[in-house]
Amino acid sequence: MTVLAVAALSARVLAEAASEEGFDVVALDVFGDADTRRACSQWLSIAEPGGLQLDAAHLLSALEMLARRGDVAGWIAGSGFDGRPDLLERGAALLPLIGTSADALRRVRDPEAFFGFLAAEGIPHPPVQMTAPADGAGWLVKDAHGCGGWHIRRVPLQGHGDPPEVAAPVPAHHYFQREMRGEPMSATFIANGREARVLGFNQILVRPFGTRPFVFCGVLGPVPLPASVAEQVGDAVGSVAAAFSLRGLGSLDFMLDGTAFGVLEVNPRPPASLALYRQRSGQAASQWAPGGVVSAHLRACVRGELPPAPAGAGDDVANPAVAGTEIVFAPRTTHLDAAAAARLAGFAACHDLPAGATRFEAGDPVCSVTASGPDAARVCALLARGRDAVHQLLETHP
């Protein structure tokens, strides 16, 4: 059995997917949730002390230990490395990294390089500039090193004669982007450094949190797109994957307004939408990636092989089933004792379960809920029901 390490802020989905495909999994993450630990033979904390971020020293120590074991094939990096190519590079020097290289991450997360490429290729995207607009109306400021939408803010508006509030130079990895009307979407893909295969298209769920208007809360799919849009977005994915040498699982985020779309960014690592394309225990082989998406990720990275094109991917017809996952955030500071954690674990639709008594600050992720159904509307309704059930448990527990 191949031993594989997966590292991320939350490694649960990667760990479960790899385990279901027959890998012996070592999981490295921040949360150490109960279901993450069940999916792996070993769990190692890489949490920043007292925080919800990756700690470089803990990560590198864990990878060095795994390298000394001698039986770990390599590691897959998930969320949490988007703005840390140097850490990715240091980790790859200790244990083989199976995925997009640190150098490729630097380039694709450089807003001038990325949006410059889109402009040169004629790939639709919202207007972008590196300095604050004179009039902030309709503009967002983003951090190219951020993830989850927590970094996105609207540019403050100025009254007549007022000095711009965002006049000071922003860090090199920040940029300003015109807000685009439409629905936030993504394309889940697998790339081999030269080309890419789109597995499907997804609807992204976002919600405002205070001054942050577009916090990522979940994703559902695959959902159908008009054939012309699916083809154009697929071409954009292929162009970006080739230009920036992307490898393995990733996603391209875009806005969709009718038949018009605009590319927002690319996530050059296994995305949250991976959960929608997994091969689950007891089910037939995944229709999107025969043998499973983690195995397909490895084949693309190591051998350059891509899965066959999924039948009907992106067609403007109903898919046989839509899956969805949503993060449930704590609405207020909450202490979940062991009894409440056990009750939460009894909810069949809940995942990313606390391993025991846990204190959550307002805005911390408590767990996730999942659902499936015949269409996106039904899945959204089921996710809302699951979210409400978790909130009710939190509100009725001191």
Residue spans for each PLM region:
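Peripheral (often C-terminal) accessory segments that flank ATP-dependent C-N-forming ligase machineries
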Residues: 11, 295-398
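A conserved helix-loop-beta module that forms one wall/lid of the active-site cleft
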Residues: 93-160, 173
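Phosphate-binding core of ATP-grasp and ATP-grasp-like enzymes
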Residues: 173, 178-222, 231-261, 267-274
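Active-site "cap" helix and flanking loop/linker of ATP-utilizing ligase/carboxylase catalytic domains
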Residues: 231-251, 268-336
